[in-house]
């Protein structure tokens, strides 16, 4: 698909919704301006309620392909790689654990370290095995970015807006037929990545993303969308993390996509 896109010269983009949030756009602009110098160290931590993998995995028999990195970690990895734009990853070493979600055929957590051509290191960590009662309805993210002249510390866990009630609260991701296994009474509001509903209307990042896409195709604006090539690279990097964890060894990058089908 990517080859066809490139051969046709099509402006194909991928919807990584986090890119359209004000806080991350602000961080991106400060990095473009060089306000913390040359970035050399990044640490990213994503925490997710286990309702998401349980609800997602129920839809397929190919459960070994639905890992925390490939399904959900791709969003925080994309954000981190976008903020590291211009730097080339040359290796990844990762580890995974499956103490809880093994009965559903997936991993609980995957932690990894990317090394870049210029020596920059990026620690990418995700756990989507948090309890159903965890107040974050979907995603909680922390990113630390250290440069030669400064640092940017991003706290995006949504703990600044908390709802507690005697009434049972729904999950953030509840496809048809899925019911949380226990009652939930506390929510970190705004932790649902696409945005929030007000009077039947969606407000938030996905609204911005959609309007920005219209502006891109109508007016030729240079928008924050991920290109098809960036989306493909994100997929390859998440799969490389899983491959490293599977075989217990560092994986050189870039990796030939065909290698994923050899064993």
Residue ranges and their predicted role:
Residues 77-170, 207-221, 238-241, 254-263:
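Contiguous beta-strand/loop segments that form the cofactor/metal-binding neighborhood of enzyme cores
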Residues 22, 51, 153-154, 234:
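Short catalytic/ligand-binding loop motif for oxyanion handling, primarily in non-cytosolic enzymes
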Residues 173-263:
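C-terminal helical cap and adjacent loop that interface with cofactors, partners, or active-site loops
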Residues 1-11:
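Rossmann-fold NAD(P)-binding glycine/threonine-rich loop
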Residues 7, 22, 75, 208, ...:
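A non-catalytic, amphipathic alpha-helix used as a structural packing/dimerization or gating element
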Residues 1, 27, 240-241:
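Aromatic/hydrophobic pocket-lining residues that form π-stacking "cages" and hydrophobic walls in ligand
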Residues 39, 134, 223-226:
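Short, surface-exposed helix-loop/turn micro-motifs enriched in polar/charged residues
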Residues 10-13, 18-105, 113, 248:
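Predominantly a Rossmann-like dinucleotide-binding segment in NAD(P)-dependent oxidoreductases
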């Amino acid at each position: 698909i990517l080859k066809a896109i490139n051969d046709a010269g099509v402006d194909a983009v991928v919807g990584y919704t986090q890119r359209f949030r004000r806080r991350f756009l602000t961080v991106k602009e400060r990095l473009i301006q060089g306000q913390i110098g040359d970035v050399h160290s990044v640490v990213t931590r994503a925490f997710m309620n286990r309702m998401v993998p349980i609800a997602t995995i129920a839809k397929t028999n190919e459960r070994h392909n639905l890992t925390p990195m490939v399904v959900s970690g791709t969003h925080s990895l994309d954000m981190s790689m976008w903020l590291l734009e211009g730097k080339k990853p040359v290796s990844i070493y990762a580890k995974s654990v499956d103490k809880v979600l093994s009965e559903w055929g997936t991993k609980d957590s995957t932690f990894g370290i990317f090394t870049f051509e210029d020596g920059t290191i990026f620690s990418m960590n995700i756990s989507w095995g948090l309890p159903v009662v965890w107040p974050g309805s979907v995603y909680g993210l922390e990113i630390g970015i250290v440069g030669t002249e400064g640092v940017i510390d991003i706290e995006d866990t949504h703990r600044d807006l908390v709802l507690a009630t005697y009434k049972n609260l729904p999950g953030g991701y509840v496809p048809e037929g899925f019911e949380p296994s226990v009652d939930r009474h506390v929510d970190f509001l705004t932790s649902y990545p696409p945005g929030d509903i007000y009077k039947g209307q969606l407000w938030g990042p996905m609204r911005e993303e959609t309007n920005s896409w219209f502006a891109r195709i109508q007016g030729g604006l240079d928008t924050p969308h991920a290109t098809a090539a960036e989306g493909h690279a994100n997929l390859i990097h998440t799969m490389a993390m899983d491959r490293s964890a599977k075989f217990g060894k560092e994986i050189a990058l870039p990796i030939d996509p065909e290698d994923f089908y050899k064993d």
